[in-house]
Amino acid sequence: MTIAGKFPPTGCRNVAGFSLLELVVVICIISGLLALAIPKLWALQVEAEKVAMEQVLGNLRSAIGIKVADFLVRNDMAGVRSLTGSNPMDRLSEVPSNYRGALNGANPDTIAAGNWYFDMQARALVYRVRNQDYFRGGLGKPARARFAIRVIYEERGRNTNEIAGATLVPLEPYVWVDKD
């Protein structure tokens, strides 16, 4: 066996791989794309939290509306009034997976961000915000929003005690902000 059979001729090299310059160019392109994508992905995460919170609030308002309609059909105004200060989560057939229950004297610092709980002392439903830098209002640090059921009165003539319904309202104003 000759050596010539083991090595290809010098003019026909089969080079596998790529050069260092090509590697640097690919890394620069990928880094640039990531630099553009990461802020957008972060904004989507904040938007997802906002939408999830609003979806739970919408579900609660619908459930409260159904209960109010039930009371109004039976002309049970005391039943409507009894909703004030009650736990809105009790109106749902299935509570969200991030609901921690009714807590007596809960310390918000001990509740994980992104969770709901009912503060039995304040008679308020509380959401602990995960993306605190994008949330203004509520009760400060840790960022949280509180809600309670309130009866709505309708003014007809001189009678201001006519019940029109009940709804879930924020106890303090809040807003989600963009950090652009």
Predicted segments, located by residue:
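N-terminal single-pass transmembrane signal-anchor helix
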Residues: T2-I3, G11-Q45
